[in-house]
UniProtKB/Swiss-Prot annotation:
UniProt organism field: Thermotoga maritima (strain ATCC 43589 / DSM 3109 / JCM 10099 / NBRC 100826 / MSB8)
PTM annotation (N6-(pyridoxal phosphate)lysine): residues: K36
Subunit structure: Homodimer.
pH profile of the protein: Optimum pH is 9.0-10.0.
Enzyme Commission identifier(s): 5.1.1.5, 5.1.1.12
Protein name: Lysine racemase
Length: 354
């Protein structure tokens, strides 16, 4: 057995995806399945397709090429704004491309015509999260400069940068922009892409107005979580991905470091609480593999204390007997899963049940 290893339950992932698709479809909303956290893993992509998802959302061309090589067909949506240095390849392999610049929109359209492709453009609008997109107050004026380009939709993002939560008011800003583009500038806006996993909470509570007809979902499907709204989604499974790490040391030590203190190896100042002598287990897993802040122990009585590049320190005082060679399991947040999937040192194992 090789550790650390990431256990992947495709059955639970498929069920999560199916539930999200069914809930959204009842309200006339299409789900774009986001594959980027798995680096475009073909088995994950196939699982989304089995659940009824059509468009696969990706941020990196390499991941799309990986899926295509494995026989996964489009449509694919480019979720990150394109780099000019990759634009030719993007137009060649993506069916939908998000942009936030008129010149880029025109270049996408020009390349699409040259390649005899029908690449559809989604123009991104910033309604407050402060990541990509034209500022909403200037959106109509800027997008109007793109007449002639194949702009079929507008979209926005929530939570990923500013932590902004989707509300009815935010959705209505998009719909107002759609109406002005169509009424005053002759656009036909077929798609209003109303955000990502944080928007599911609004969907559940009837806060998404009619006219928002697409969501781009990754975190909810892969983990059954919504970090922006700080919740576990109770109607979805969290038994989708688990990471296992092997114990390499068990010792009783003070709970506060001894001596003059500076910052840790990552420049962080760590606050330690004096709890006396505690039993600590070190696992062969570190920040090079995961985000230690996003590790959630499966076992009761286990607490993640801190981590360095290759070591994670656990408090196991309340767990019971622990010895070198034992294995602990953890659930993960999105940031933690992203690092685990990206790390070449984490073995990926597909399990029917975990």
């Amino acid at each position: 057995m090789v550790y650390p290893r990431l256990l992947i339950n495709l059955k639970e992932i498929e069920e999560n995806a199916r539930k999200v698709v069914e809930m959204a479809s009842r309200r006339g909303i299409e789900i774009v399945g986001v594959t980027k956290v798995t680096l475009g893993d073909p088995r994950f992509a196939e699982t989304l397709r089995k659940a009824g998802i059509g468009i696969l959302g990706e941020s990196r061309i390499r991941n799309v090429l990986r899926m295509k090589k494995a026989g996964i067909e489009g449509p694919f949506m480019l979720l990150r704004l394109p780099m000019m240095s990759e634009l030719v390849e993007d137009v060649k392999h993506f069916d939908y491309i998000m942009v936030s610049d008129p010149d880029v929109a025109k270049k996408v359209d020009e390349l699409s015509r040259e390649m005899k492709r029908n690449v559809k453009i989604i123009y991104m609008i910033d309604v407050g999260d402060l990541r990509e997109g034209v500022w909403f107050e200037k959106a109509v004026e800027e997008i109007a400069q793109c007449r002639g380009a194949n702009i079929v939709g507008i979209g926005t993002n929530f939570g990923c940068y500013g932590g902004i939560i989707p509300t009815r008011e935010k959705f209505e800003i998009l719909l107002d922009i759609k109406e002005k583009l169509e009424k005053n500038h002759g656009f036909n806006i077929e798609i209003v892409s109303g955000g990502n996993t944080p928007a599911l909470y609004a969907l559940e509570n009837g806060e998404i107005p009619e006219g928002i007809n697409q969501l781009r979902i990754g975190e909810a499907i892969v983990l059954g979580r919504d970090i922006t709204n700080n919740r576990v989604i109770d109607w979805l499974s969290q038994n989708t991905f688990l990471i296992e790490a092997e114990v390499i040391e068990v010792k009783e030590k003070p709970s506060v470091p001894l001596g003059k203190r500076g910052l840790d190896v990552f420049g962080r100042k760590v606050d330690f609480v004096d709890r006396g002598i505690r039993k600590r287990a070190i696992c062969a897993l570190g920040e090079q593999d995961i985000d230690s802040r996003g590790l959630i122990p499966v076992d009761k009585g286990v607490e993640v204390l801190h981590a360095s590049s290759d070591h994670i320190v656990l408090d196991v005082t309340d767990f019971g007997d622990v010895k070198v060679g034992d294995v602990f399991r953890f659930r993960m947040t999105y940031s933690c899963l992203l690092k685990a999937m990206t790390s070449p040192f984490v073995e990926k194992v597909y399990e029917p049940s975990i």
